[in-house]
UniProtKB/Swiss-Prot annotation:
One of its GO terms (cellular component) is plasma membrane. GO terms for biological process: Actinobacterium-type cell wall biogenesis; cell wall organization; response to antibiotic. It holds the Pfam family Arabino_trans_N. Its main location: membrane. This is Probable arabinosyltransferase A. The lineage of its organism: Bacteria, Bacillati, Actinomycetota, Actinomycetes, Mycobacteriales. Residues 804-825 are annotated as: Disordered. Belongs to the emb family. The chain crosses the membrane at residues 12-34, 204-223, 258-280, 334-356, 368-387, 397-414, 421-443, 463-482, 531-553, 582-604, 616-638, 653-675, 696-718. It comes from Mycobacterium avium. The gene is embA. It is a multi-pass membrane protein. The keyword Nucleotide-binding does not apply. It comes from the Bacteria.
Length: 1108
């Protein structure tokens, strides 16, 4: 009877687990196919009038092409165009970049009317026939099936094109001067397939499915408690176990058991992570993810803002949804990076309090070894800091991997299946953070055999249906997360676009990920990142060698150690299936690296005492890792480099490369190991005396090496923040945000970038009473070789050459990328005739009517020289700290570190104008020139360089080089009237912030996207020239579906001079101002008609056009 009672007590939870599991599985499987409510958006034209005629409208579609387009123009309206023709109608303004290549254009000349979709003619009609009334209406259309046009009534004047010719729409533009009337219409159905919300039915199913899965897991937990055997597990603790055994007043005692070493390690690791949170460098994708999070509420979904034609980020979007919630509180970096830091803290506490105790329980085990605990902390931090201090998903993936491993171990240790079910949920949540989150599945795979044995062992009491149903239901729960608002059709379409646009790299080329780590002069192959990956690989393969050779390490549990090694190895294998191969994805292994570090240090402390040669080989390997790591630069992303030593070179000490020092030491220890190996045949023994000193020496090499790297990394960034203060750094911005209480008045880089809204306002005036020649005061008395038209026509700057592996770069993965990048208006050309007869197109908004130019271009027979008249300096004030000369060509200058850029001599000479009318020359100074040559740029002469008595200045130019490439041109000096970028732009003006800059300007508002239509920005904030050329201009390109798709089609740009406060040598980036090609009063923003329709989960509204 007791046995029957036990059977009955098992039957109920077993039945509940089976029924709830099957129900949860079926409900969750149905979620992707259930209907959703899709917001529809339509633009109708005409809208309003200008001077009694139909007005043009602006409506830049995020997807480029619409879902459907239908335009009808009465032929009598076409006949109203002038005799020489004009624009009948178009979907892009004619002056935009590649307008004809991308848009629909209906043009008329004196002979014909032509309808062209993307430079392909669809229909042609003779203009006299149109004017004579032979046709009634011109009809043009495009949809998922085809594109075409027809002059109704004219035989043969029609044509159809493939659907790939569907045009890009930025609005409706026309030269027609006709009133709105019957037959004149345009309809643009915007592609809003991703702006969806679950229907009531879908919400009910998701809620019921989630509840059913949770019920099944709870029922399985009840089965676990009733089915477990009498065996107990010694020294096992996990967060789940701790919570289940929580008793008030007892938890502190449990935590004290870990020992003093663990508490010291906890304090050191947590302090380092918190310090790094403030001073540490950010990741390459902080701006990317922050902008997506900020625009999501108005966009209606988590839109891929910088690429991929406005597709959704699903299935990898739940983390971005979390960031969007955080951004609604504050966009300050120190706030937005909290998830990453909390994930780091969580990872370490799991390692120190549970993973190590699982790997080596007991008094003599790994968890009780102080050096192993300290090594775990050092290796973990060394692996965490270079990768995981930003908004990328790797920090959460690292945490998810550890939690999954821990739950699997709990399931195995206690022979319980509920932790395994929870592990499945956690692993799949981790996998949907990003493609590299797939490594969390490795923990499931390595523990699957042991879990399967537990299922078989309990088959008699629990059966197979209940546990398998629960595990399958747990597996299906991820569908609720991924398809909570999207459908299977939209997610598949998003994936199709991403694979079509790229970049994607095949799985068998995963070696490129490791190659990127070796690329010099690249932050992704920096010293810190190289060390993190190399030391993890050393620990992984070192432990494999030790265990395969020796089979057992006393003090280390056999099963968990193999599953830890297997999780890492299988994780690296699964990483090959990610479509991108960025080196930053190694950050997902940070938690595993820390645990492997402890395991390796403990194992080597045991075997090192057995054989001197093995210990020496261990030290040799570590020295070689250091040598390889320090062959990279101490580089960090973008502003993370500010003030950091060796950010662009290999570390050096006393002019000697550090890498050579470590390589020499590794060679010496390698030779010593070889000598010890051959001596083994003659020595009586090779063991080291088992003393405390020798045990410490055998176990500490990895600890010492990892600590050196951690101290170097933290000291580098801290030094930059402290010694540069009050100049801009990430640390300064974070401290300011904290001090302000995350106030919106703390605006990071926008508070330190000085902008010159009107370059003409600061122009200096000549000192009265001077004489000068016909070229004006800028030419001085008798210029030789310098003339107003001495400026080259083509001032395109030298190319930027970057090496492979740069994140968010659409360049070749295996050869250098050569790209050009010039600020708007700086690449030369012809412009209006200037005040002294120059025809050069001036940059930075300089007014040619007030700005003379002198240059030596074309003077190839004698040395050119010119000394300008004296210009009056204004009284010195803190808000006007510079004298600036806009110049082009090759100019000699020195960088901050003393290296020079070759060119010809342009100097500024200070002087003193005395009351008696005389002028006394003072010192001459060379400019600060951030480049690039030969484009127009602003040479800087800090007024702090001027003698206190100086009140005038003049330009002294000398060009003795007769080479056609060695010339330069200049404009008069000015003292810019500046204001901060925050004062110029404010927090409400829409701005296009490039990926690299977006996280550094938290107060600026990224242009919004609403109902599939983009808001046109007024400004663009760019990073430094190299980053712009290698990343921004490629990743955000129109061909890839980035914002340039509509920005370059609808806007023109001009560069605003900017300077980073106090950091005059710094190329921080630039600011460009946008102007509409068709002004807003002529083509106002379109009114959009909004609606809602219900679509099924499998419904596909045709492919999004994603062709170049």
């Amino acid at each position: 009877m007791p046995h029957d009672g036990k059977q009955r007590s098992q039957r109920i939870p077993r039945s509940v687990a089976a029924v709830a599991g099957i129900a949860g599985l079926l409900l969750c499987l149905a979620v992707p196919l259930l209907p959703v409510r899709q917001t529809t958006a339509t633009v109708l034209w005409p809208q309003g009038t200008v001077d009694g005629h139909v007005s043009q409208i602006t409506a830049p579609l995020v997807s480029g092409a619409p879902r459907a387009l239908d335009i009808s123009i009465p032929c009598p309206a076409v006949a109203t165009l002038p005799a020489d023709g004009g624009l009948v109608v178009s979907t892009l303004p004619p002056g935009g970049m590649d307008a004809g290549k991308n848009g629909l254009f209906v043009r008329a000349n004196k002979d014909v009317v032509v309808v062209a979709f993307r430079d392909t003619v669809a229909a042609v009609a003779q203009r006299p026939a149109v004017a004579a009334g032979a046709c009634s209406v011109l009809h043009a259309w495009a949809d998922a099936g085809a594109a075409g046009a027809e002059f109704v009534g004219i035989p043969g004047a029609a044509g159809t094109l493939p659907a790939e010719k569907k045009p890009q729409v930025g609005g409706i533009f026309t030269d027609l001067k006709v009133p709105a009337g019957p037959g004149l219409s345009a309809r643009v159905d915007i592609d809003t397939r991703f702006i969806t919300a679950p229907t009531v039915l879908k919400q009910i199913v998701m809620v019921l499915g989630t509840l059913a899965v949770l019920t099944a897991i709870v029922a399985l937990a009840v089965l676990d408690r009733r089915s477990r055997g009498g065996g107990t597990l010694i020294n096992w603790r996990s967060p789940i176990a701790w919570l289940s055994r929580y008793r008030p007043g007892t938890h502190l005692a449990n935590w004290r058991r870990v020992g003093l070493a663990t508490w010291i390690a906890d304090a050191a690791v947590l302090a380092t992570l918190l310090l790094w949170h403030v001073v540490g460098a950010t990741s390459s994708d902080d701006g990317y993810n922050l902008t997506i999070a900020r625009v999501a509420p108005k966009a209606g979904y988590l839109v891929d803002y910088y690429r991929y034609f406005g597709t959704t980020d699903a299935p990898f979007d739940w983390y971005l949804g979390l960031l969007s919630r955080l951004a609604s509180v504050s966009t300050a970096g120190v706030w937005m990076r909290l998830p990453a830091t909390l994930a780091g803290i969580g990872c370490w506490l799991i390692i120190s309090h549970w993973v190590l105790r699982r790997l080596g329980p007991g008094r003599g085990g790994l968890a009780a070894n102080r050096v192993a605990v300290f090594t775990a902390g050092a290796v973990f931090v060394a692996a965490w800091l270079p990768f995981n201090n930003g908004l990328r998903p790797e920090p959460l993936i690292a945490l998810g991997v550890l939690v999954t491993w821990m739950l699997v171990e709990r399931a195995i240790a206690l022979q319980r299946l509920a932790p395994a079910a929870v592990a499945v949920v956690v692993a799949l949540l981790t996998a949907t953070l990003a493609p590299q989150g797939l490594i969390a599945v490795a923990a499931l795979l390595t523990g699957a055999r042991a879990v399967a044995q537990a299922i078989r062992r309990r088959r008699a009491s629990d059966g197979l249906l209940a546990p398998l149903a629960v595990l399958a239901a747990a597996l299906s729960l991820i569908l609720v997360v991924v398809f909570r608002s999207q459908t299977v059709a939209t997610v598949l379409e998003s994936a199709r676009i991403k694979y079509k646009v790229g970049p994607t790299i095949a799985w068998y080329q995963d070696w490129l990920r490791y190659y990127f780590l070796t690329v010099e002069s690249n932050p992704d192959g920096s010293m810190a990142r190289r060390f993190a990956v190399l030391v993890m690989l050393l620990c992984l393969f070192g432990m494999l060698v030790i265990l395969l050779r020796r089979g057992h390490v006393p003090g280390v549990a056999s099963g968990p150690r193999w599953r830890l090694i297997g999780t890492t190895a299988v994780g690296l294998l699964l990483l090959t299936f990610t479509p991108t191969k960025w080196a930053v994805q190694f950050g997902a292994f940070a938690g595993l690296a820390g645990a492997l570090g402890a395991l390796t240090a403990f194992a080597c402390s045991r075997i090192g005492l057995h054989n001197r040669r093995n210990l020496t080989l261990y030290v040799t390997a570590l020295l070689f890792v250091l040598a390889w790591a320090t062959s990279g630069i101490n580089g960090w992303f973008y502003v993370g480099n500010y003030g950091v030593p060796w950010y662009d070179i290999q570390p050096v000490i006393a002019s000697h490369p550090v890498t050579s020092m470590f390589l020499t030491l590794s060679i010496i220890t390698g030779l010593l190991a070889a000598w010890q190996h051959f001596r083994m045949d003659y020595a009586g023994h090779t063991e080291v005396k088992d003393s405390r000193r020798n045990r410490v020496l055998a176990s500490t090499p990895l600890l010492v090496v990892a600590t050196i790297m951690v101290v170097g990394e933290v000291a580098s960034l801290t030094k930059g923040a402290v010694f540069r203060y009050p100049l801009y750094t990430t640390g300064k911005a974070n401290l300011a945000a904290i001090a302000s209480g995350l106030s919106p008045t703390s605006c990071a880089m926008a508070d330190d970038v000085l902008a010159e809204p009107d370059a003409n306002a600061g122009m200096l005036q000549p000192l009265p009473g001077q004489t000068f020649g016909p070229d004006g005061p800028l030419g001085g008395v008798n210029p030789v070789g310098f003339k107003p038209d001495g400026v080259g026509d083509d001032l395109q700057s030298d190319p930027v050459v970057t090496k492979p592996g740069l994140v968010n770069s659409d360049a070749s993965p295996n050869k250098p990328n050569v790209a050009y990048s010039d600020s708007a208006g700086t690449a030369g050309g012809k412009g209006p005739v200037g005040v002294n007869g120059s025809h050069a197109a001036l940059p930075f908004g300089l007014d040619p009517a007030r700005t003379p130019v002198m240059g030596s271009y074309g003077e190839n027979s004698l040395a050119a020289t010119a000394t300008s008249a004296w210009y009056q300096l204004p009284p010195r004030t803190p808000d006007r700290p510079l004298v600036v000369v806009s110049a082009a060509g090759a100019i000699w200058s020195y960088k901050e570190d003393g290296t020079f850029t070759y060119g010809q001599s342009l100097k500024l000479q200070w002087g003193v104008a005395r009351p008696d009318g005389s002028t006394v020359p003072l010192a001459e100074v060379q400019p600060i020139d951030i480049g690039p040559q030969p484009a127009w740029r602003n040479l800087r002469f800090p007024l702090a360089w001027a003698p206190p008595e100086a009140n005038v200045a003049r330009i002294v130019a000398y060009d003795p080089n007769l080479s056609s490439e060695q010339w330069f041109a200049f404009t008069p000096p000015r003292v810019p009237v500046t204001e901060t970028l925050q004062q110029l732009i404010g927090s409400q003006t829409p701005v296009m912030m490039d990926i690299a800059t977006a996280a550094n300007f938290p107060c600026q508002r990224p242009f919004s996207e609403h109902l599939g239509v983009a808001e046109l920005p007024a400004y663009r904030i760019l990073p430094d020239r190299k980053q712009t050329a290698a990343s921004s201009n490629l990743w955000q390109s129109s061909e890839a579906g980035g914002p340039f798709l509509f920005l370059q089609a609808l806007l023109r740009t001009s560069t605003i001079p900017t300077y980073l406060r106090g950091d005059w040598y710094r190329d921080w980036g630039s600011v460009e101002q946008y102007f509409r090609l068709v002004p807003a009063d002529q083509a106002p923003d379109a009114a959009i008609e909004q609606g809602v329709m219900t679509v099924h989960g499998w419904s596909r509204q045709g492919p999004i056009r994603a062709l170049p």
